[in-house]
Amino acid sequence: MPLSRRLSLADAVAIGAGSMIGAGVFAVWGPAIGAAGAALPTALLIAAFVAFCNATSSAQLAAAHPVAGGTYAYARAEIGPWTGYVAGWCFVVGKIASCAAMAMTFAAYAAPPGWRTPLAAAAVVALVAVNCLGVTRTALATRILVVVSLLGLAVVVAAGASASGAASPAPLPDATAYGVLQGAGLLFFAFAGYARIATMGEEVVAPARTIPRAIVIALTGVVIVYALIGGAVVLTLGADAAGAASPLTDVVSAAGWQALVPVVRVAAAAASLGALLALITGIGRTTFAMARDGELPRLLARVDPRRHVPRNAELLVGAVVVVIVLSADLRGAIGFSSFGVLLYYLIANASALRQPVTARRYPRLLAVLGALGCLVLVAALPVEASLLGTAVVLLGVLLRLITRAVTRRSRRDTTRA
């Protein structure tokens, strides 16, 4: 049964923005400043440019292949089944880790230490239930959460503007080339989410026109927001931001706006929920597409006849995220997620390069630069994250080899019978 096309341009933009404006914008500035130092603006520009290149490739592919699954489906069509499978696997496992990171960040802002893990798990369960009620409700809830998040970020920008004139922050340290790239990699985690729209190709109205516009609009808006937030943090806190657990609340406190600190905390929690909501939706759709193609158990390809959502896929994703929340920490989840996400977009750029001239909407150079950017940022990740990510990708390859062998044997047995 096909999915229902219900999402408008505004819905798609809200889902993309809700995916990007999540845990990253509230947590990434300390580590990014610690890595990039005085070159933070350069790191932000690098991350934004790589994200833009990836977005153009995703938009071009989505226009030619308006189906659920994102780069998994695009790579299957443009390169081959194996490449598509690796892309889908990287997306699913990487974004499941992102879901866990978003849930942990929500709980960190919303609950005292002893209650954070149970609350994070409860948030995952609740949002999976929202997804199972139907994609229209998912889009509406995401739009509400994005508005709340932007209000909190507006408070931070205003507080930073108020305090920057009187503040005397410690100067930022000089940066190394590796530090700038590491900072860009951290900031890229905060951008990831724009192509979430492309994974919902079977649910967007007029996808060939809507998806490219939605990706560009959402990314442009988020770049502007991040530039304003980064400026407020640097001008108010300076080098002290590197050691801050919650730099955005520190900016508001430095301005003397103590009464508004809870507003920022609520916004952080809302942003994390918004990103988690959109992530679960995107992962569920990719899992649905892979199961429909026989790459994963067929049970995951079933669509709820009433709600028109892949309920089994959503429930499985939610269960795995809860397990990670109960067993891992935030840093580990983010590091592993970055590895999977960058490989996913590397394959997206490679797929865009394989498209015929008639399907190109953007210069080939953007796809080349996007692929190179992904490779460079992967190389700048911590060694532990790279080793774990490589092991999980190889595990996925082994899983497909076993699945294909079992399928061939089953077919031979059926033929003999």
Question: Which functions belong to the PLM regions below?
Answer:
Residues L296-D304, L346-Y362:
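Alpha-helical transmembrane segments
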